[in-house]
Each structure stands twice: as structure tokens, then as C-alpha cells.
């Protein structure tokens, strides 16, 4: 609960979940009703926070996160750039190997917001877009939203 609260407070404000949702849903975003969009954004945000904090808790085995676990690389961007990629490396426990983690951000309304994260070259947006497209074909958008809500409830019980 402590790590989830930390993520809610320090991570969520820096992610544009509406933009991420648009990218993840693709064509389905355009045909979704405003209510479906709102519900999807809420459940998807809850899912991402719960899923990744659960993974972080497992990674750290419940202990504090070591200071040297993540290293950010120098930013390569121009002064007028509106989109940038911030690269980092995350150490694996018990290994000298580091996993590349890249954050894609865009500048709007005077602030930078994350719209995608790639772990070891695999985009969160692309992964969910593929997975959710199959689920939408099988169950419809409302079915996907219901499934996310159910998964969130399961993650809340952990």
C-alpha cells in the first residue's frame, strides 16, 4: 500500500493517461462514447499503477528500493523539442546486467508528460494495444473495461 500511494502521488501526475489511453485503444477510442472513454481511462490507470507497483514490490521483495537501482542517461534533446525520450538503465537483482527503460514524453500546457514507457525495447503502449485489440474483438470495449475492473479488484486484494 505504501509503494502504491507513493506511485499515485509521484508518478500519476506525470503521466497523461488520456493520451496513453488514446494510443492504446487506437481505432476503438474514436468509436467509444465519452462515458466509455472516462471509464477506460479510470480502470486503465488503476490497472497500470497496481500492476507495476505489484511488480516493483516483488522486485524489491518488499524492502526499500536501493538508491543505485536506476541510472538515467544524458538527455539528447534540442531547446524547442516537443517530444523527447529519457533513457535509463535498471539493475536486475543479483545481476550485473541492466535493463534499458525509456520514457517517451511530450510537452504541453507548460509541462512534460509521459505517454509511453519501453522496457528492454518493448513499448507499453504497443503491448497493450495488441492485447486490448484482441479483447475488444472478442468482448467489446465494455467487456474490456469490466475485465480491467475485475483485475484491479484482484490486485487490490493482494
Task: Name what the model sees in each region.
Residues 1-56:
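Early exported N-terminus immediately downstream of N-terminal targeting peptides
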Residues 14, 19-22, 28, 118-127, ...:
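Residue-level preference for alpha-helix termini and adjacent loops
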Residues 98-126:
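Short beta-strand edge/turn micro-motifs at domain boundaries
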Residues 7, 12, 64-67, 116, ...:
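Short, functionally important structural connectors and interaction interfaces within domains
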Residues 121-158:
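Non-transmembrane domains of secretory- and envelope-associated proteins
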Residues 40-42, 46, 50-99, 151-158:
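Surface-exposed, charged secondary-structure patches
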Amino acid at each position: 500500500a505504501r509503494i502504491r500511494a507513493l506511485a499515485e502521488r509521484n508518478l500519476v501526475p506525470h503521466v497523461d493517461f488520456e493520451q496513453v489511453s488514446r494510443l492504446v485503444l487506437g481505432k476503438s477510442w474514436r468509436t467509444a462514447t465519452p462515458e466509455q472513454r472516462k471509464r477506460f481511462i479510470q480502470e486503465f490507470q488503476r490497472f497500470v499503477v497496481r500492476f507495476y507497483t505489484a511488480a516493483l514490490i516483488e522486485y524489491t521483495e518488499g524492502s526499500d528500493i536501493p538508491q543505485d537501482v536506476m541510472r538515467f542517461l544524458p538527455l539528447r534533446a534540442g531547446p524547442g523539442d516537443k517530444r523527447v525520450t529519457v533513457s535509463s538503465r535498471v539493475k536486475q537483482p543479483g545481476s550485473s546486467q541492466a535493463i534499458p527503460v525509456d520514457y517517451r514524453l511530450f510537452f504541453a500546457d507548460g509541462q512534460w508528460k509521459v505517454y509511453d514507457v519501453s522496457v528492454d525495447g518493448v513499448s507499453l503502449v504497443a503491448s497493450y494495444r495488441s492485447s486490448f485489440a484482441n479483447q475488444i474483438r472478442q468482448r467489446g470495449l465494455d467487456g474490456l473495461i469490466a475485465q480491467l475492473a475485475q483485475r484491479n479488484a484482484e490486485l487490490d486484494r493482494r
